[in-house]
Design a protein with these regions (language model features):
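Basic, amphipathic alpha-helical/coil surface patches used to engage anionic, phosphate-bearing ligands
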Residues: 2-442
Length: 442
C-alpha cells in the first residue's frame, strides 16, 4: 500500500495541469463520490489565502524552529513504517502552533503526548496498523459498533476534505454497550480519528492547503431519549481530549442539521465535558434552507454526492448501507434478559458436552451486579444454593457495571458438565437490575 504521508514532490504529475492526473489516496478508494481538486485550482477555493500552507510556514517559522529544539527527543521516536508513521516535519509542528494559538508550552505538551502514544508498540499494532492497512472496518468490534451507530463517509468537500456523517435518529447509540466494552468504543473512536486525520493530511500535503474534515450530524427524528447517555458522553469527551493532542487542525466544523428544539439546551449541559476548542466548532444549521440549498453548502460541498434529504442530488435509496440504517440491530439481538431484584440473586447456565470453551456476554442497563461463574461436573449434585461438592471456580466474584459496557470473552471448561453464572444484587437495598446476557458452548 502506498504511504498516505508521501511528500508533495512525490505526488506531482508532469504535463498539462488542466489534464492533471490525481492519484487517489488509499482512504478515498472505497468511498462513493470523492472528488479531488487539481492543484491548478487551489487558488480558486474558499479561504485560499487563510489556508495556504507556505504562507503559514513562513509566518510561524521562528516558532517552528523553537519547537524543533524543545521536542527533539520525542520527534526522534518516529518509526520507519510510512504507512503507520506520520512525517514529523515543519507542517506537523505548524498544526500544533495553530491549534494552540502559538502558545509553545501547550504545543510542546501536546506534541509529547502524541509522539509517545504513537511510539507505543501496542498502539502501533492494535490501533494504527489496521487503519494503515485499511482493514480496521473489517474487525468484529467495528461491525458490532455498526449495529448501534449509523455513521460513515460519503462524497467530499470542494477541496477534497472528508465529509463524515452521523445519523443519530436511525441508530440506538445508548445500546452500544450491549455489544462493546468501553475500551472497544474508544478504540473505534481513536481509529476513526486516525482515518480522518490521515485523509486530511494527505490532501494538505498534495495541495499545499490545509484540508480539514467536516462532520455532518443529522438529528432528524432524534428523541431526547436517544441522546447520548452519561456513558457515551464520557467516551466522546475522552475522544475530544485525545484529538486535542493527536489530531490538530483536523476538523473545520461539527455541523448539526435538522436539530430538534432541545439541542441548544443539551449542548449547553454537556459542553463543560468537552474541550473548549472542540465546542467552538459546533454549528447548528437552520432548518431552512436545506444545507444543499444554502450559500454555505454551495460554497463548501460537492452537491452531486450530498444526500437529497439534505438538499443535494444523491438519492437516499443509493446510500451505502452504513448510512442507510440497515445495519442497526433492533431489539436485543442474541441477548437474553433477566431481572435481578433487590437483595436477591439470579442464575444463568449452559450445558457443556465436552471439554471446551464457553463464549459469554453480559450487559447491564444501569448500575452494577456481582458475577461469579462455577463449573459442576455432575449437574445432579448441584443443590438449591447452586453448589456441588467438586465445583470449580471459573470466574471469581467480579463486579460488572453498565459504566464499563459489555463484559464478554471466553471461559474454558475442563470436561462435560454445567457452567452456572451467579448474578448477585444482594448489596442493593432499593433497586433491581436488568441484565442482558448470552452463554454459548463453542
Amino acid at each position: 500500500m502506498a504511504a498516505i504521508t508521501e511528500n508533495l514532490s512525490n505526488l506531482k504529475v508532469s504535463g498539462d495541469e488542466e489534464k492533471e492526473k490525481i492519484k487517489m489516496h488509499p482512504y478515498g478508494i472505497n468511498v462513493i463520490g470523492v472528488k479531488q481538486v487539481p492543484k491548478s485550482k487551489v487558488s480558486t477555493l474558499p479561504k485560499a489565502e487563510e489556508r495556504d500552507v507556505n504562507t503559514l510556514l513562513e509566518k510561524y517559522k521562528d516558532s517552528i524552529e523553537e519547537l524543533k529544539i524543545k521536542c527533539k527527543d520525542v520527534l526522534s521516536l518516529n518509526g520507519n513504517d510510512p504507512g503507520i508513521d506520520l512525517i514529523y516535519d515543519d507542517l506537523f509542528l505548524l498544526r500544533y502552533i495553530l491549534s494552540k494559538k502559538n502558545n509553545l508550552k501547550k504545543a510542546e505538551e501536546a506534541i509529547r503526548i502524541c509522539c509517545k502514544w504513537r511510539a507505543d508498540p501496542e498502539v502501533r499494532e492494535q490501533m494504527l496498523k489496521p487503519v494503515a492497512d485499511n482493514t480496521w472496518t473489517e474487525a468484529p468490534v467495528y461491525k458490532s459498533f455498526c449495529k448501534h451507530m449509523v455513521f460513515g463517509v460519503l462524497g467530499s468537500q470542494v477541496d477534497g476534505g472528508i465529509l463524515f456523517y452521523l445519523r443519530d435518529g436511525l441508530g440506538e447509540p445508548n445500546a452500544v454497550f450491549e455489544s462493546l466494552s468501553r475500551d472497544d468504543f474508544l478504540k473505534i473512536g481513536f481509529q476513526s480519528r486516525e482515518y480522518v486525520y490521515r485523509w486530511c493530511d494527505t490532501e494538505t500535503r498534495r495541495l499545499g492547503r490545509f484540508v480539514k474534515a467536516m462532520f455532518i450530524i443529522d438529528m432528524n427524528k432524534v428523541k431526547l431519549s436517544q441522546m447520548p447517555d452519561s456513558r457515551v458522553q464520557k467516551c466522546y469527551a475522552e475522544l475530544g481530549e485525545f484529538s486535542e493532542n493527536n489530531n490538530p487542525q483536523m476538523v473545520d466544523k461539527y455541523l448539526i442539521v435538522n436539530a430538534p428544539s432541545f439541542i441548544p439546551w443539551f449542548i449547553k449541559i454537556i459542553g463543560p465535558l468537552f474541550p473548549r476548542s472542540m465546542m467552538e466548532k459546533f454549528d447548528i444549521f437552520p432548518s431552512t434552507p436545506n444545507l444543499g440549498e444554502s450559500e454555505f453548502g454551495k460554497t463548501w460541498i460537492n452537491l452531486e454526492y450530498l444526500p437529497d434529504y439534505l438538499g443535494g442530488t444523491f438519492p437516499t435509496k443509493d446510500l451505502p448501507k452504513e448510512l442507510s440504517g440497515e445495519l442497526v440491530q433492533r431489539g436485543d439481538g442474541d441477548l437474553n434478559k433477566i431481572t435481578v431484584g433487590r437483595r436477591s440473586r439470579k442464575y444463568c447456565e449452559v450445558m457443556t458436552p465436552t471439554k471446551g470453551k464457553v463464549d459469554y456476554k453480559f450487559a447491564l442497563v444501569s448500575k452494577g451486579v456481582y458475577l461469579t461463574a462455577m463449573f459442576h461436573k455432575n449437574p445432579k449434585e448441584v443443590n438449591k444454593e447452586q453448589e456441588s461438592p467438586d465445583q470449580i471456580v471459573i470466574q471469581e466474584k467480579l463486579k460488572i457495571s453498565a459504566e464499563n459496557g459489555v463484559y464478554s470473552g471466553v471461559w474454558e471448561v475442563p470436561e462435560s458438565g454445567i457452567l452456572i453464572v451467579e448474578l448477585s444484587n444482594a448489596h442493593s437495598r432499593f433497586t433491581g437490575k436488568t441484565v442482558k446476557w448470552n452463554l454459548d458452548f463453542i
